Amino acid sequence: MPDTVLYTAEAVSTGDGRNGHVTTSDQRIDLDLAVPVEMGGTGTGSNPEELFAAGYAACFHSALRVVAGRQHTALGDSTVTAQVGIGPDGDAYGLVVTLVIHVPGLEREKVREFADEAHQVCPYSRATRGNISVELRVL
């Protein structure tokens, strides 16, 4: 837990949860939600897994850049892709995540080192550690 909270995001869900609407207090996110076709829905809106994937990809990418920066290494046109899956987990549902890390022009072993360290400091990784499977895949 942080010693000091620097920023708090706030989002409100209305309607029917996964088939509803979500808005952030600053109105930057204002989305209709829909259950994916693969789960029996219409797939006509976004869903919690897409939003989680977007947040995790951005957060991990920032952590990766911080870690590399500490070693005075520029990551250039790096990308982090978060793949978030959902499926039955006993009598509930669970998530699985794969983070695909691509840093053109940097040795794969060095990227792996940075990714492993970023996984230790990324707030999303810290929040999910021990709760869901997170695979780091370095291209």
Regions found by a protein language model. Give the residues of each.
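Extended beta-strand/beta-hairpin segments
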Residues: 1-54, 61-139
